[in-house]
């Protein structure tokens, strides 16, 4: 939800390219990366991973459904991507989540399930 967070006055920090690079390294081997965003233009200009597929033109519900069907999930600090990962029924999924969810130093230990990577 990058587009939403550009106007949030720091309530939710925007994840860095380095966060996504580290997350892809944790996932390891993959056939392709599906990119879901409300700021696809920025993603196309700034994310440089092999085999990217930019998902465009869907409703939010369609995106949520597609995200929940992915083999793994790299999520932002958003409830939208959190729910997509939570609803993913792949028993062997790897979920990578940002450690910092809010601009203020708040306790977020109860947000991320223990089996998810928190970087």
Please place each PLM-identified region on the residue numbering.
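Leloir-type glycosyltransferase catalytic cores
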Residues: 103-119
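A donor-sugar binding/catalytic signature common to diverse glycosyltransferases
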Residues: 60-107
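Residues at the C-termini of beta-strands that transition into short coil/loop
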Residues: 56-58, 99, 115
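Core catalytic architecture of nucleotide-activated donor-dependent transferases building glycoconjugates
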Residues: 1-60, 91
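Generic serine detector
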Residues: 8, 13, 23, 37, ...
């Amino acid at each position: 939800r990058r587009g939403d967070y550009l106007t949030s006055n720091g309530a939710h920090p925007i994840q860095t390219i380095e966060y996504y690079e580290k997350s892809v390294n944790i996932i390891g081997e993959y056939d392709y990366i599906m990119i879901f965003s409300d700021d696809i233009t920025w993603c196309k200009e700034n994310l440089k991973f092999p085999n990217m597929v930019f998902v465009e033109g869907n409703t939010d519900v369609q995106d949520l459904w597609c995200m929940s069907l992915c083999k793994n999930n790299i999520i932002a600090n958003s409830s939208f991507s959190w729910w997509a990962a939570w609803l993913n029924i792949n028993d062997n999924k790897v979920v990578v989540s940002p450690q910092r969810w809010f601009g203020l130093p708040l306790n977020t230990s109860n947000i991320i399930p223990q089996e998810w990577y928190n970087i």
